[in-house]
Amino acid sequence: MHKLTGYTNRWGQKQGATIRFHVSSAAKTPFRLRFVRHICADPNPEGPGYEEIELPSPLPATIPGQEHGAWTGSYAQADALKLPAGALTLRATIWPTTPAKGPQGILSLDLPGWSLALAIGPNGGAMLQATAAGRTIAAEVPAPLMARHWYDLTGTLAADGTLTITQTPHRPLKDAGTATAPGATPCPGAPARALIAALPPAGTNPHASAHYNGKIEAPAILAGQTQVATWDFAQGIQTQTATDTGSQHAHARLVALPARAMTGSTWTGAVHDWKSDPSQYAAIHFHDDDQGDLGWPETFALTIPTNWPSGFYAAHISNDAAEDYIPFFVRPAKPASDVAFLVPTYSYQVYGNFVREGRGAEIAERAKARGALLETPDMNPQFGLSCYNHHSDGSGVSLVSMFRPQLDTRPRQMAHIDPAHPHGSGTQRICVDSYFIHWLHHEGIAHDVITDHDLHEEGLSLLAPYRVVIAAQHPEYHSDRMMQSLEDYLSQGGRLMYLGGNGFYWRAEPSEHAPGALEIRRAESGIRTWATEPGESYHQFGGGYAGLWRRIGRPAHKLVGNGFSCQGLHRGFPYKFTDGINNPRVAFMTEGLTPTPGQAFGETGHQGGGAAGHELDSVNFRYGSPEHILIVAKGIVIHEDYGWVNEDMLTHRHPLPQEDWACADACFFETPAGGAVFSVGSMTWAGSMPIQGTLRTLTTNVLRRFIDPAPFPWPE
């Protein structure tokens, strides 16, 4: 378990502005603090060379440490609900997903010395449980609930203290039943807290306990025939508030990002967009391992000095037992160069805390030898999951918050053992993208660093001042505003260098009501670790259709010329120049080179041992690649590790020859406004960038021409 870690309130910030840090220290003693700028974040001694620059800190060298908890499990909470004295009825419609896991709260009430809960009991049946003065009475239906079926549950505490619980399946199943138990204490009549999808706190968690897995619809509290509270989850689907339609308006706040816009018990299959008929989406799916904003208090705040260059930064925190780097990115106070490097922080966040069982043990020996950070998400489940994981009930993780430590999004870190290169770096995210910073720095090319989150907030105005925008190794996730801004930038003559693979692939949506949260839903098709449930393909945050940009009419091919076509392990192969390299339109690429068609380059690299590998993009005119595009090089990866993307899998055979899809197409095209696009089509291109050779020279030539203000003429 990580003993010293933290997070920031923003991925990046401008010079002169303030960024806030939230740190938990298990030692509860002061920790050391320093700030570093990363030129290269790869700790591999066989790599380009780890390079950090320590900066004079405006903050103390030691900071008082406090320990803060990290809790998982979503629920809804309403406070100060006025309960009448005497009898009460609790009611809900549920779709449980793990009824056999043990007690799980569905709707509970508690006040000092008394509580009442509608729940799933220890034997898997519906249960009503009352506690007063430390004495608990419970009635549980003998028949266990079945997973992924709808039930109506009604629990009544009578004035004489009798508990009655009934479960009624919506389908003709044999698990209907009723149970009773005498001797409970009626409601004393006082303001109470209501919890939906959990029981009152117990043990070490001060917030709630016995978290429920599954959907809940229309939880309600009645006193006889009088409505005390009824929460309608069909209202305010885009918000983090559950609306009480009763007279008290005891609206409940949602905790830890449960999933909304979920099909409810009345869903017919005729509606797929929740906005068309919210009543069919009146359910919330809660999970016992959901996690939102951890809410740690601010530990220290940094007003970024105006003389710190734009770049990759980290707060390095350490004590005698642990250390961590908390990354952040510095923007100039106003644009200061012709080049913007766009950090794919949306993709960082979606992938963050990708739990892969055994990964920590797998890399431990090599990571220790390299002096890399040793903490991994599988070793720290308290910090939640990524959108590549499944919840404990088997459903996909669709919501993630940046307000938690993201342990696999750090500098000086390994991610995996390179399968093809004995000295491969096995890096990802920040460490890989730092190869581009290393290149720009050592080539002496001035650049500003901006983030995806900046782009969503500011749109085209962020990009417009720059002559060139560089998209990094794996810019996979984008919001609608980000895609539109990139399109508008190109339409105005901007130049875009896309130096990775599997980019511009999935739609992602931020929330106006849950700061720091992102949502993705994996609709229809695509390379993915899980798929959305039927009828749940529209985002709850923005209400837009989810899934691949290609399915929404914005394939990457239209934006950058190529698009995701092939995936395999981290095993790289060389590129070979095509006839396109001799076209006069790209003569600028060959300065200092004498390329010939068929000539190989990118034969080595710090990722997979070659420049074409892992996730590859190819040109496809059917999907929108411009007709005048030039393929200047192609990396063909015919290997058993590699297969085509499943959105192209219409039958058991691919419609194209393997060399047309198992390839990375490095391509170039001009835009009507005098701009241009250069795309490399491979995630492992980045690993070859620190190596002096043809690939680096070619990339540098492209950038220098893109910086040149002379417009690109439209080809004849």
Language model regions located:
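Aromatic-Pro/Gly-enriched surface loop or interdomain linker
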Residues: 28, 38, 262-292, 322-462, ...
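Extracellular glycan-associated modules
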Residues: 15-20, 26, 40-270
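Helical hinge/lid and interdomain linker segments adjacent to catalytic or ligand-binding clefts
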Residues: 289-290, 301-303, 307-309, 422-512, ...
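Short secondary-structure boundary/capping segments
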Residues: 92, 170-172, 247, 355-359, ...
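Ligand-binding face of N-terminal immunoglobulin V-set domains in extracellular IgSF glycoproteins
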Residues: 5-30, 37-41, 48-50, 55-74, ...
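Short, surface-exposed beta-strand/loop micro-motifs that present aromatic residues
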Residues: 115-119, 438, 663-671
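Short, solvent-exposed loop/turn and secondary-structure capping segments
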Residues: 34-35, 44-47, 103-105, 118-119, ...
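Glycine-rich, aromatic-lined ligand/substrate-binding cores of catalytic
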Residues: 514-706
